[in-house]
Amino acid sequence: MENFKHLPEPFRIRVIEPVKRTTRAYREEAIIKSGMNPFLLDREDVFIDLLTDSGTGAVTQSMQAAMMRGDEAYSGSRSYYALAESVKNIFGYQYTIPTHQGRGAEQIYIPVLIKKREQEKGLDRSKMVAFSNYFFDTTQGHSQINGCTVRNVYIKEAFDTGVRYDFKGNFDLEGLERGIEEVGPNNVPYIVATITSNSAGGQPVSLANLKAMYSIAKKYDIPVVMDSARFAENAYFIKQREAEYKDWTIEQITRETYKYADMLAMSAKKDAMVPMGGLLCMKDDSFFDVYTECRTLCVVQEGFPTYGGLEGGAMERLAVGLYDGMNLDWLAYRIAQVQYLVDGLEEIGVVCQQAGGHAAFVDAGKLLPHIPADQFPAQALACELYKVAGIRAVEIGSFLLGRDPKTGKQLPCPAELLRLTIPRATYTQTHMDFIIEAFKHVKENAANIKGLTFTYEPKVLRHFTAKLKEV
């Protein structure tokens, strides 16, 4: 198998879901009704759904079987302890709080860390800034609604689609330390390391970079939270690209990675492969006070701390999914599938970010240079792709980034990207070929695609529910 051109799907398909075909006229009407926002389309009207890989893929037979062990006790569930044991074995973290998904963890830990910094270091809430290699949208949103400014400190190669670089997700370490000094260390409530960096194109962060970032954080006594949605994909890239770790297992690399954070927050709907679930975990006793405070908030916002909004069967499934998501053959196939799609798009002249872990990212700014950033070229491209082929994708650019909450001005975005997110074990190579062919048709009509403007704009996380029209 090692010498074959393409790696086949390393699984057998046992259950299928029929999908509906639609006409171009039907799709044009549907996208207009949705306010030119693919998030608001009905799933029944989508032929290939590349909106997200979050909870949209298949599960393994071992995960499905694990659900039968679910203990639905309100408190002290046996299934909770199975999940907590998986966390200890994989990440080395001693304290676990389950949540319904990643944002459930964020709404708990962010206010707790801000309060802790205020009480212990005299944080000035009017001056507080949190740093990341690049904040995920909901992490940014929860920070902002708690009054915290966010600052992304990424390397210059990160968003240059013409550059190939092994670890485009890396922190700009000089920029990080300079930023901390600028705002004052006591006004930095937390640093978030996002692995992989979703907004940069699913790009990995090297272990060397994480070590250096953590050293800076410890110098200023700032807590580090690992945003862990795609921890296994990041470990795979480290194995492939960081020579020191080429002979390490994914499990060993993962354990090493989590030495360089104090907490982890996870949407388990990605690399842990579950339809619903999240985690908030603390490494050791030095964050026991944070754990205690977060448990209290969990009761109010998610559920009792030993279920956190999840049924017992879902916790059992997650306990297994954390392991299944680290399977080396599975990861090799998944990364190869993304690479295949990127290669196919570039062969027809569609510029992409270098292949990352979970999606192909099309450079919409280059495909639609006539549409300015404030008319959202990647969102316009998403609408055209749906009209042409019934494919739903998602904008990662100015539309998602939003406005400065203090000034109301559009935040400058480093790139206008369209994310083609591949759900796990759901679509085959034939689907990838269809997507590539769809882009041939889109490219032929690119000059006629129009920009977009708002008819309704929410103040926070606008990309989920905003409505637009063509300019």
From Swiss-Prot:
EC number, as in UniProt: 4.1.99.1
Enzyme class label: lyase
Protein family (similarity comment): Belongs to the beta-eliminating lyase family.
Top-level lineage group: Bacteria
Reactions catalysed, as given in the entry: L-tryptophan + H2O = indole + pyruvate + NH4(+)
Keyword entries, A-Z: Acetylation, Lyase, Pyridoxal phosphate, Tryptophan catabolism
MF (Gene Ontology): tryptophanase activity
Modified residues (N6-acetyllysine): K5, K115, K156, K450
Protein name: Tryptophanase
Gene3D superfamilies named in the record: Aspartate Aminotransferase, domain 1, Type I PLP-dependent aspartate aminotransferase-like (Major domain)
One Pfam family from the record: Beta_elim_lyase
The protein's annotated pathway: Amino-acid degradation; L-tryptophan degradation via pyruvate pathway; indole and pyruvate from L-tryptophan: step 1/1
Quaternary context: Homotetramer.
InterPro entries listed in its UniProt record: ArAA_b-elim_lyase/Thr_aldolase, Beta-eliminating_lyase, PyrdxlP-dep_Trfase, PyrdxlP-dep_Trfase_major, PyrdxlP-dep_Trfase_small, TNase, Tryptophanase_CS
PTM sites of type N6-(pyridoxal phosphate)lysine: K270
Requisite cofactors: pyridoxal 5'-phosphate
